[in-house]
Amino acid sequence: MITTNSAMDLPPHSPPTLSNDARVIALVGLAHGVSHFYHLILAALFVWLKPAFDLSYAELGLLMTVFFIISGVGQALAGFVVDRFGARAVLFSGIFLLGVSALALSTAHSYAALMLGAMLAGMGNSVFHPADYTILNQRVSVARVAYGFSVHGISGNIGWALAPLFMTYVATHYDWRIALQCAAVLPFGVLLILFLNRHAIRPEPVKKAAPGQAAGGEGTLDFLRLPAVWMCFAFFFITAIALGGIQSFASVALVKLYGMSLALATSAYTAYMLASAVGMLAGGVVGARSKQPDRNVAIAFSAAALLAVLLAMAVVPAWGAVALMGAIGLTSGVAGPSRDLMIRAAAPKNATGRVYGVVYSGLDSGLAVGPLFFGALMDGNHPALLFVFIGVFQALAIATAVGVGGKTRAAALQKA
């Protein structure tokens, strides 16, 4: 019999004080920010890498595709390692690999070497979601875990926002190799901070289990039989396709659709990211006060989908398009903490790392597929359809969220 957690109990040696919770949330958020920073260290340097290695845009794009494929596959596997050996050691190894990947990229003299660096970065990135969420679930009190998820999401957005600024600034004033060497300092510095505070993020003791059995006495792969787990995977896959379209082509589509300058279109994307961070902050409050996170997700994504379709209609002036991008980011951000609470409720006991690893591999899969799909739309000169399909994918995600909530509540009633 597989049981799920609606509220994972805190271990007795971790008192639920505000200071303890805030410390854990800050440390995990710091690590997650590094992960998202590394999502874009290569993309931010494409302008320099293209002439330096005489590469096509397809070859540059393949570097990112390989990064996310390695990260997605590794993420699913990392969840098993987290549950077997503990989240802290796995998190430390991932951060270390990110630093090594930047150093490897900085010394690359061939496309193959760049590919190796991208693969190392993907391996390092793969551990963060299963490790981060396991630590948050184990070390943060139930009353404040929604705020932990909120900060976790915001820190990721900050990493996304800072990477292009930092990498392009250093590469412009010095060299792209120096930019990568400077980027390597970040994970090694954060690793030192985490090591000095390692007691705060210590894992729960891993119970010995018979071969083929999870720590809780259930089969290691039993959680894969839960429909809610695969609905969560589908939710992340679908929403990540939409996110991939926004990240890769929203600015270009706005230029074509509204006739605005590239600078204003870039500002619209910035508005999306900043508003998303604000939405995550508000979403933490909403999630903490709600007992049905799937409904919060459904409402937020309904609004985001309608706004995306409105943006596609080009019935507002250019400044209105910027505002709509911000509104889409805000509503999508509100859904973030409730989304993570939804997964937490669906996760079987003692399988947190495995569930988050499999579920979040859907995010990397969607981010790998999204740019290919939306790139084809843009090659066909269909900027309006880009936003229409972003809305369609967000609407499709609603069905998976409602399905997860229904399955989780049914399982809870059956257990009762």
What residue ranges belong to the model's regions?
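Helix-to-loop junctions at the C-terminal end of transmembrane segments
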Residues: 74-86, 280-292, 378
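Helix-loop-helix hairpin linking two adjacent transmembrane segments in secondary transporters
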Residues: 152-200
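Cytoplasmic helix-loop-helix junction between adjacent transmembrane helices
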Residues: 117-156
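Extracytoplasmic gate region of multi-pass secondary transporters
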Residues: 42-43, 228-273, 277
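Cytoplasmic membrane-interface "Motif A"-like loop-to-helix N-cap segments
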Residues: 84-94, 289-302
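Conserved MFS/SLC helix-loop-helix module at the cytosolic interface between two early adjacent transmembrane helices
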Residues: 73-109
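Residue-level signature of mid-helix packing/kink "hotspots" within the transmembrane helices
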Residues: 40, 68-76, 160-161, 273-281, ...
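Juxtamembrane intracellular "pre-TM" segments in multi-pass secondary transporters
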Residues: 9-19, 202-231
